[in-house]
């Protein structure tokens, strides 16, 4: 697998890492660059210099994404797309803290600490307020609960607990972990 990725990861290409998509505030940026970050971490031992360049470029790219959060925690696109962005930023945060002992201050950007409250206000137990072409599925439980714990808030966890206790949703592993 490493041979398939080696030399082909677009975050390392000087031209591609300057491509506008890598400097975007859209959810696509967090999705793709979050994947490049995780793949780089998986293959880091094979060529540390190469893959650390991918890691550095990924972090730089994610700095553009976090600017998509409003001070209130809202997302520049729609609640559904915001959930995608938040989901991958939560995975980045947990992975980077485990691997590097740092989240590189990405969760400290404006509004990030209020996303959970915003997502909770936009979602019921199984649907999200549909705006534009975004999905109307409920919030991604693992990422929202992880970030609730990260910020020391109970915005989503408290509502989620009520949904579980009232029988509206089945408990998940994350209900126990967080």
Show where each model-derived region lies.
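Aromatic-lined, polymer-binding surfaces characteristic
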Residues: 1-123
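Carbohydrate-active enzyme catalytic cores, enriched for enzymes
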Residues: 81-178
